[in-house]
Amino acid sequence: MDSTTHGPRTHVPGRLFIGLMSGTSMDGADGVLVRLDGPRPEVLASASLPMPAALRDELFALNHAGANELERAALAANGLARLYARAVRQLLDQAGLQPGDVAAIGAHGQTVRHRPDLGYTLQLNAPALLAELAGIDVVADFRSRDVAAGGQGAPLVPPFHAALFAGGQARAVLNLGGIANVTLLEPGRPPRGFDTGPANVLLDAWCQRHTGQPYDADGRFAAQGQVLAGLLEHLIASEPWFALAPPKSTGRDLFNLDWLLARLQAFDGPAPQPQDVQATLQRLTARTVANAIDASAAAPRDVLVCGGGARNPGLMRELAYCLQRPVHPTDDAGVPAQWVEALAFAWLAQACLDRIPAGLPTVTGARAARVLGALYPA
């Protein structure tokens, strides 16, 4: 796309938005083109583009201190914007639409630092470049406004979960990306939500290290092993973050391969087999989700699961075992699990344009709800 796409918007019934998300797993960029003026989002097109290996490696590296970080971060952000622009082109082509038909893009960017305790969160993104390439207004930098108001800046999806899935009974909505986060929906109460701990971030890293595959497809590697109860308890007991009360959030800054290797080295027991570690990590995700829900005093009747982890049948079985209640992908409620986060950022972009506060103090701990995001006009 080039500057010839810029210009006045044509009329398309309803307001159309694009949501773009690349999560903690850094496996690719998910995008949706959606109509948001009805009672439920209407997905007109969807796309998932794999992350180029060189960009993925650089983004991984930028999660840790290193040489020449500023220039490398700027170049990686530009690379991500170009990947996003390819996703936008694919979405428009699928739907037979032009850039002027879309009100705005909500682009999350790639989190490389998340330190709300120090007053900042950093998502690599180049929204100005994306606006130029796509010819569509871009809303980005959703998290920092909440952090400025004293909040965690995460999770941001609970108000969207509430809009989609709230009903007459208590339920939980669990997002299994790199990090797991849960939204608690209880009649008569504002939504609550918080991160519960690692999900795919450790599963993917360990699988990559021992099989060469970027993720554990269908949980097959974990299925070759067995849960090591002693190791599981060691992983939980050795990490103070698990015992923190909400509001709380986390990321790859804390939970990463180095975190896991340090705890394996400190484990007072026989050296575990790689497949047993994978099975134990799968249980770790499920157990910490269950522990967090139990500690919240919520009593959800069921749990709806979205994100990449919803496609892992082994992990879904572990969740059902640990939660002792029905566990279903959000597909069963009419919303494809793979696209929920991208849909959420389309929804957040609309809220920003309409100047509707979308942060929830009951989730992030901010002083008050704020309008989230910054606008980069095309």
Swiss-Prot record:
Enzyme class comes to transferase
The UniProt keyword set, sorted, is:
ATP-binding, Carbohydrate metabolism, Kinase, Nucleotide-binding, Transferase
Which branch of life, at top level?
Bacteria
Could you tell me which pathway this protein works in? Answer: Amino-sugar metabolism; 1,6-anhydro-N-acetylmuramate degradation; Cell wall biogenesis; peptidoglycan recycling
Where ATP is bound, by residue?
Answer: G23, T24, S25, M26, D27, G28, A29, D30
Pfam families linked: AnmK (PF03702)
Annotated GO biological process:
1,6-anhydro-N-acetyl-beta-muramic acid catabolic process; amino sugar metabolic process; peptidoglycan turnover
Q: Which InterPro entries match?
A: Anhydro_N_Ac-Mur_kinase, ATPase_NBD
Example GO molecular function: ATP binding
Which residue ranges run through the membrane?
A: none
Listed under catalytic activity are: 1,6-anhydro-N-acetyl-beta-muramate + ATP + H2O = N-acetyl-D-muramate 6-phosphate + ADP + H(+)
The EC code for this enzyme is 2.7.1.170
| Family label | Belongs to the anhydro-N-acetylmuramic acid kinase family.
Write out the function statement from the record. Answer: Catalyzes the specific phosphorylation of 1,6-anhydro-N-acetylmuramic acid (anhMurNAc) with the simultaneous cleavage of the 1,6-anhydro ring, generating MurNAc-6-P. Is required for the utilization of anhMurNAc either imported from the medium or derived from its own cell wall murein, and thus plays a role in cell wall recycling.
The molecule here is called Anhydro-N-acetylmuramic acid kinase
Q: Which organism is it from?
A: Bordetella parapertussis (strain 12822 / ATCC BAA-587 / NCTC 13253)
The gene for this chain is: anmK
